[in-house]
Regions:
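Short N-terminal targeting/anchoring amphipathic segment
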Residues: 58-76, 87-89
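Active-site proximal beta-strand in glycosyltransferases
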Residues: 67, 83-106
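Membrane-proximal helix-turn-helix segments that form the acceptor-binding/catalytic region
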Residues: 57-61, 96, 111-136
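N-terminal strand-loop element at the rim of the active site
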Residues: 5-44
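Helix-loop-beta element that forms the nucleotide-linked donor phosphate-binding surface
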Residues: 82-85, 128-163
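A short, charged, and often flexible helix/loop element on the N-terminal side
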Residues: 28-56, 108-115
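Conserved catalytic-core segment of nucleotide-activated headgroup transferases in glycan assembly
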Residues: 158-190
């Protein structure tokens, strides 16, 4: 409707393909995540390395369209020299190393907490990949301030996840549905 075509690249993990996406996207590509112990034997965050797939970069190289990297976990190819001349937009979901540190503090189980602590350290070291983005979009003003300090030479904009909250624009009444935004299997979202 807006004259924009979307090519969506997504990773399969704990859920099936979504045919609904094909009705709003020009193309939808699915990739399998590399999960398990082997995918964890790296200096990169597990949640980044597990999304490494040569077919993804091959598909990205088929055109010269802008690329939106949704979350730091999706940035494996952000610094790939073959994408040097592409418009790259990084939309952060949260400050990942802070998120994983909080998971480690609130989690149950020694191995699980150790994983979260290691992943926090990996993400803190890895966040420098955002310097390869032409634009960084922050989801909160606090995150925008943090990112401006970390990347003073980058263009950083604040675009909130939700509608403005100083007025209600929803129609009064009840509905059969309610929207929860968050992964409920994560301890912080329970």
């Amino acid at each position: 409707a807006c004259g924009v075509k979307l090519i969506l690249h997504c990773f399969e993990y704990e859920r099936p393909h979504a045919p609904e996406l094909e009705s709003i996207c020009d193309k939808v590509f699915y990739y399998k995540r590399r999960t398990g112990v082997i995918a964890n034997l790296t200096w990169l965050p597990y949640n980044v390395y597990s999304r490494k797939d040569h077919r993804l970069i091959e598909n990205l190289l088929q055109n010269d369209y802008p690329i939106l990297f949704e979350g730091l976990h999706s940035c494996y190819y952000m610094d790939d020299p073959r994408l040097r001349n592409r418009m790259k937009i990084f939309r952060e979901c949260n400050i990942e190393h802070d998120y994983y540190r909080h998971l480690a503090k609130s989690g149950k189980g020694l191995v699980r907490n150790a994983f979260f602590k290691i992943e926090a350290m990996r993400f803190q070291a890895y966040q420098k990949v955002a310097q390869y983005a032409n634009l960084i979009i922050a989801v909160s003003t606090t995150d925008a301030d943090y990112l401006r300090k970390q990347f003073p030479n980058q263009r950083i904009e604040f675009v909130p996840c939700f509608h403005e909250n100083n007025r209600i624009t929803a129609k009064p009444g009840k509905s059969d549905y309610i929207l929860y935004h968050g992964k409920l299997s994560v301890i912080e979202n329970e």
